[in-house]
């Protein structure tokens, strides 16, 4: 089972495309939708939905995957639910760059302080990070600098922020999932 979390643009047709691409790894891909506008509510909702899916799950190596803001959530929810994560261009600093787009961007900073201390150290090697060199929305190098101590970083030379085509990375993701 692969759980997919969309980014800020929840209505993007690219979400359906990524789900279809992920089905080459596992036919059981589940999209969880969330508001993107209310961080504390989103965290509660995502934890509840992922936990529900894991309770009914028969796959002993589930994976959670997210793009952009979905990558922010996939890393945290995956850690809290003890499943491996794959994140594409994760928005690591939504409290800085979501100003004017969501109601309370400061809630992201609050969530970060309430998360487990040094959670990335405890999550070491359980998250695969795929970054685009042509991300027009976020500073990929800043993300790499933040994450490379804990996770493997894979650089993509073609895609932009929304990462329309993930197919060149499917074999790597599949191998990462099987490590479980």
UniProtKB/Swiss-Prot annotation:
Taxonomy, superkingdom: Bacteria
Alphabetical list of Gene3D superfamilies matching this protein: alpha/beta hydrolase
A Pfam family matched in the record: UPF0227
InterPro entries from the UniProt entry: AB_hydrolase_fold, UPF0227, UPF0227/Esterase_YqiA
HAMAP family per UniProt: UPF0227
Family indicated by similarity: Belongs to the UPF0227 family.
Official protein name in the record: UPF0227 protein YcfP
Organism in which the protein naturally occurs: Escherichia fergusonii (strain ATCC 35469 / DSM 13698 / CCUG 18766 / IAM 14443 / JCM 21226 / LMG 7866 / NBRC 102419 / NCTC 12128 / CDC 0568-73)
Gene: ycfP
């Amino acid at each position: 089972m692969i759980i997919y979390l969309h980014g800020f643009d929840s209505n993007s047709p690219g979400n359906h495309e990524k789900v279809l691409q992920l089905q080459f790894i596992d036919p059981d891909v589940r999209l969880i939708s969330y508001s993107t506008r209310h961080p504390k509510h989103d965290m509660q909702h995502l934890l509840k939905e992922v936990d529900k899916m894991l309770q009914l799950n028969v796959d002993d190596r589930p994976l959670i995957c997210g793009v952009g803001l979905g990558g922010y959530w996939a890393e945290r929810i995956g850690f809290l639910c003890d499943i491996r994560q794959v994140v594409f261009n994760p928005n690591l600093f939504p409290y800085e760059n979501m100003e004017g787009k969501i109601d309370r961007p400061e809630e992201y900073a609050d969530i970060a302080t309430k998360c487990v201390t040094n959670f990335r150290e405890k999550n070491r090697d359980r998250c695969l990070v795929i970054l685009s060199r042509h991300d027009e929305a976020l500073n990929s190098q800043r993300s790499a600098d933040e994450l490379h101590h804990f996770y493997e970083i894979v650089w993509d030379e073609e895609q932009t922020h929304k990462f329309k085509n993930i197919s060149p990375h499917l074999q790597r993701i599949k191998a990462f999932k099987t490590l479980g």
